[in-house]
Amino acid sequence: MILSPADQERIETFWNYCLKHQYFNIGYPESADFDYSALFRFFKFSINNCGDWKDYSNYALNSFDFEKDVMAYFAEIFQIPFEESWGYVTNGGTEGNMFGCYLARELFPDSTLYYSKDTHYSVGKIAKLLQMKSCVIESLDNGEIDYDDLIHKIKTNKESHPIIFANIGTTMTGAIDDIEMIQERLAQIGIMRRDYYIHADAALSGMILPFVDHPQAFSFAHGIDSICVSGHKMIGSPIPCGIVVAKRQNVERISVDVDYISTRDQTISGSRNGHTVLLMWAAIRSQTNLQRRHRIQHCLKMAQYAVDRFQAVGIPAWRNPNSITVVFPCPSEHIWKKHYLATSGNMAHLITTAHHRDTRQIDSLIDDVIFDLQGASKRTVGF
């Protein structure tokens, strides 16, 4: 590949920009503590995982053997026998959520998708793309779904086969919907377990809860039907990706034969990135679960440190149990832009992903927020 001098200079400028901002992220859930340099040589090849990793494919350059290992690992941590599961490495959390909703729609074609107003924005888009009826449910103060409102709307709609989109860590507050509570409440109104579907969006917390001492319900053992997790968030990856796992019996109803590549396919995207499979494989092979527990404990400790610092000066910061997302009042625009914070209404958050090995970046943010919020308070009082 030959670039013009101007294009070479442009690429070099972007390289230096990336180096400068490599560890900038404190407002969005993307870990930057990864090193996949051992895999760089594979970027010489067009590796395409089109189709089903468990079957033969006529496209020779695939990483199916590695994808099988990845899926076996996630079946284990999400507590479903490997032979009873199927899933794949996706392009990201939205594709995983779409896959789960697609399975649910095929199982219950005329049913309504119920999700809380704190659910990721992409779910509304998914409902439109899949032409599913949908219903937005109110949220509790901490970001969990409002269980009373959920049941009220299911009863009002006379829904016999509700499709529940459960958050295992909401985007802004890290709230985890109580899967067991949802099932109990549905049973109380006479809806049997076989008559509804629960998809779990565990984009960030899916790689936290398996490694803490007292996790909230999140897995197939707790009653879910499918789950997705992002690869670029808690795990860390230079390329956005994700993993989705579902019950094999539900996947088989959408599977189709593809003569062109001599295999079966039940994925959303068809051609899939074989390189991200290698990244996820290397990530799970290079750490033990004990090391992951230590990594998660560090992140949780940093989150609590941030809460304590805010609260020590009277700023009402908080976090949900087992969450590395710290919520606090939204500062002035120049502050949240300076630190690249995610904001929603009158709240902002910081997320203590694993590349924050010490408190320096957190302290810099907190110092600015304290000065901004306390200064605003003094100006209001003075006025």
Curated annotation (Swiss-Prot):
Signal peptide: none
Cofactor entry: pyridoxal 5'-phosphate
Pfam families per record: Pyridoxal_deC
Keywords: Decarboxylase, Lyase, Pyridoxal phosphate
GO molecular function annotations of the record: histidine decarboxylase activity; pyridoxal phosphate binding
EC supergroup of this enzyme: lyase
Entry EC no(s): 4.1.1.22
GO BP, sorted A to Z: carboxylic acid metabolic process
Domain of life: Bacteria
Family in the record: Belongs to the group II decarboxylase family.
Subunit structure: Homotetramer.
Protein's UniProt name: Histidine decarboxylase
Naturally occurring in which organism (per UniProt): Acinetobacter baumannii (strain ATCC 17978 / DSM 105126 / CIP 53.77 / LMG 1025 / NCDC KC755 / 5377)
Source lineage: Bacteria, Pseudomonadati, Pseudomonadota, Gammaproteobacteria, Moraxellales
